[in-house]
C-alpha cells in the first residue's frame, strides 16, 4: 500500500474481507476521483520509457533484488494507493499490464504502455469482483480500448507467477485467438518480460 508517500503492507485475513475492501472502492466510471496519485499507477512504465531499463541498480545487487521482489509482489497481489482521503486498488493483472506489458498503439503506430483510464480501471475491478463472488462477467465495450491486450495480460500474469496454472481462451472465430490474434500478444509479452525483467 502506498499511503501518502510511503509503502506499507496491507493484509486481508479472509476472502470476504478482501471482497469487502474491493466493493468499498468500486464506483461508476468517472467517479473514481483520480488525482496526481494516479501518476504512480504506471510509474514503472514511465521509468522504463525514460531510462530504457526498469532498475538501474547493478544486476544481482541487493537493491536490484529488492526492486524486483517489490514489483513481483505488486504483480501478484495488486497495489493500493491512498492520498487525501481517497483509496484506489490496482488488481495484480492491471498493475502488471500498466507497467510491464507494452501494447501496440494503433494511433501512433508504435509500442508503448497503456495509459491509466478509468473505464479500464473499472473493468479490472468489475472482473475481480466477479471472480471473488465466483461469478462470470460480461462486458459491453467499444472497440480499440486494448481489451484483448488487457485480457492476454491477465493470462500472462497467471502464467508468469503461478505454478501449475491451466487457462482457456475461447472466441467466435479461430483467428481472434491464434497467432494472427490474441496469441500474438502473449508472444509479445513473453519476449518483453524475458528481455527486460528479472522474473
Regions flagged by a language model, labelled:
Residues 1-199:
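Phosphate/NTP-binding elements of NTP-utilizing enzymes
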Amino acid at each position: 500500500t502506498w499511503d501518502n508517500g510511503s509503502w506499507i503492507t496491507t493484509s486481508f485475513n479472509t476472502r470476504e474481507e478482501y471482497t469487502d475492501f474491493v466493493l468499498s472502492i468500486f464506483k461508476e466510471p468517472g467517479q473514481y476521483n483520480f488525482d496526481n496519485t494516479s501518476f504512480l499507477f504506471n510509474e514503472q512504465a514511465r521509468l522504463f520509457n525514460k531510462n530504457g531499463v526498469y532498475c538501474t541498480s547493478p544486476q544481482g545487487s541487493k537493491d536490484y533484488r529488492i526492486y524486483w521482489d517489490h514489483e513481483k509482489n505488486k504483480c501478484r497481489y495488486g497495489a493500493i494507493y491512498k492520498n487525501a482521503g481517497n483509496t484506489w486498488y490496482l488488481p495484480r493483472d492491471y498493475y502488471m499490464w500498466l507497467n510491464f506489458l507494452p501494447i501496440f498503439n494503433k494511433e501512433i503506430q508504435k509500442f508503448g504502455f497503456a495509459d491509466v483510464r478509468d473505464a479500464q480501471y473499472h473493468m479490472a475491478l468489475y472482473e475481480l469482483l466477479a471472480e471473488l463472488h465466483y461469478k462470470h462477467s460480461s462486458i459491453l465495450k467499444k472497440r480499440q480500448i486494448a481489451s484483448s491486450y488487457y485480457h492476454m495480460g491477465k493470462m500472462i500474469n497467471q502464467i508468469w507467477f503461478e505454478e501449475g496454472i491451466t487457462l482457456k481462451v475461447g472466441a467466435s472465430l479461430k483467428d481472434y485467438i491464434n497467432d494472427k490474434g490474441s496469441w500474438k500478444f502473449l508472444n509479445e509479452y513473453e519476449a518483453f518480460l524475458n528481455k527486460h525483467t528479472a522474473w
